[in-house]
Amino acid sequence: MSYRMMLLAFVPLFSAVVGDGGCPVSQNKMGRENTEWSISYAFHMTDENRNLPRVLLVGDSICNGYQEGVRKLTDGRCNVSYWVSSYCVTRPEYLRLLEFYLDDSEYAVIHFNNGLHSTRTETPKWASALSDVFRLIRDKQPKAKIVWATSTPLKSAEKSVKVRELNEAASEVVRNLGGIVVNDLYSLLDPFDREEYWSDMYHHKMNLRQKEAEQVATTVLSILPASPSAELRK
């Protein structure tokens, strides 16, 4: 399997990247965290599978937790690239970083989330920046189908209030723009027991990450152009 990888910032707290440990969200101040990180991979760039439709997953450590499962479930049907980071959409560098990946390949589907690193950001400001992101995606990738993935609930019901607020604001942005598919990961995860399925305040254990991967993969395959089947690879 061929791949290219761009590591923009090494994270000493690596567990925050892989989705199993603490995440420095609590250090968020003015939309910026004490430790910012960004990781990306693009698979099958030169091998015999390079001409399959390409999908871009954009998110944070939650996305990093399910991206491997998505790649396995969609293997042979599409190529999956992903960019995961700690950056809030309100950061000036966010659009510049996103633009780099949008210019890298032609994508059939772009599955997008931003939110858990924005829980201390003013919601109207975040929603405005999110709208700018979707406009950039459409400008750079006019043929791509866009999926908005809702941010997932936190272990704390009290702290999840802000997540729901951001999701509601995002829903309004999506409705106003039109033509964007919604993948409601919040509703998928919300019924599960927090003590049993959450590994910390933000992240999920493997069995729950697999459920996320299955829903993401199903959503992607259902809108993938010329997809021979929406069935997941077993």
Q: What do these predicted regions represent?
A:
Residues 8-15:
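Bacterial N-terminal signal peptides
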Residues 103-105, 140-141, 223:
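Glycine-rich phosphate-binding loop signature in dinucleotide/nucleotide-binding domains
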Residues 111-117, 134-168, 189-192:
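Active-site segments of SGNH/GDSL-like serine hydrolases
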Residues 23-132, 155-157, 161-164, 203:
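Conserved SGNH/GDSL esterase-like catalytic core that processes O-acyl groups on lipids
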